[in-house]
């Protein structure tokens, strides 16, 4: 089974992380000066590099991916017992003397209040060899007492130009050529999420090949084609109600879930 493009092109170094120059600059300086924080809170929209940066920090520190890096989905491990199990595990030493252990908690806002409170003591006084990286799309739901014990880095939505540039680079490597109008629409549709853009780019090519059009994208996204939309607008202008209903009926028959914007 072929590896998904967003996984294949997940950044594995600071210089490859797209659209987060402020975060990269801060982490680069802290690594260089050997003064990384014991706990971080990465907040921002999905698909903008939060988990990728957490993994990059761990690998840059030489952490063994099996023994020294622990990723926890707080959405499904959000109870007090889950945090107690985490607290018990942090005292295990790293795989090599002097190495760090990195714990990445994704969707940390999903922790229950009881679990969050159970985590506070550990977060405040972690073992010297442990770094916590908490990630969230909803920082306003994270307890203030947790926020105050972390270095908070806010991730930005990625700009369309950077998304298009990345898609072009992936296309070049994969021998995929999709026209610029389609790439621009993919970037707009992704709303600043590079992961979403790469997924839509891959889906578009897998479905329609290099000759994909904007209307093909509309089909994938469940939206009405430009041609149909123009006919609807013209019919509204001429107050041709029967034609409007006819067009909408045809759209519903062919694509029941398609949206008229």
Q: Where are these predicted regions, by residue range?
A:
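P-loop/Walker A NTP-binding region and its immediately flanking N-terminal helices
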Residues: 1-152, 161-162, 170
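Extended, largely alpha-helical regulatory/partner-binding modules appended to the mid-to-C-terminal parts
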Residues: 48, 54, 59-60, 99, ...
């Amino acid at each position: 089974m072929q590896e998904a493009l967003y996984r294949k092109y997940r950044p594995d170094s600071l210089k490859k992380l797209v659209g987060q120059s402020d975060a990269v600059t801060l982490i680069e300086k802290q690594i260089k000066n050997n003064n990384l924080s014991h706990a971080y809170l990465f907040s921002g929209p999905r698909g903008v590099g939060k988990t990728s940066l957490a993994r990059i920090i761990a690998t840059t520190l030489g952490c063994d991916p099996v023994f020294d890096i622990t990723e926890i989905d707080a959405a499904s491990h959000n109870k007090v017992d889950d945090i107690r199990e985490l607290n018990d595990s942090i005292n295990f030493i790293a795989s090599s003397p002097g190495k760090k252990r990195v714990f990445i908690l994704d969707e940390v806002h999903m922790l229950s209040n009881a679990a969050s409170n159970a985590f506070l003591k550990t977060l405040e006084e972690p073992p010297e060899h442990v770094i916590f990286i908490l990630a969230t799309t909803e920082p306003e739901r994270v307890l203030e007492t947790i926020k105050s014990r972390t270095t908070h880095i806010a991730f930005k939505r990625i700009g369309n130009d950077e998304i298009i540039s990345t898609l072009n680079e992936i296309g070049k490597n994969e021998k995929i050529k999709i026209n610029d109008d389609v790439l621009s629409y993919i970037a707009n549709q992704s709303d600043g999420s590079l992961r979403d853009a790469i997924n839509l780019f891959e889906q578009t090519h897998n479905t329609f090949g290099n000759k994909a059009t904007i209307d093909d994208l509309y089909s994938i996204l469940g939206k009405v084609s430009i041609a149909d939309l123009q006919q609807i607008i013209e019919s509204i202008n001429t107050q041709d109600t029967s034609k409007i209903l006819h067009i909408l009926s045809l759209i519903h028959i062919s694509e029941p879930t398609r949206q008229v914007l």
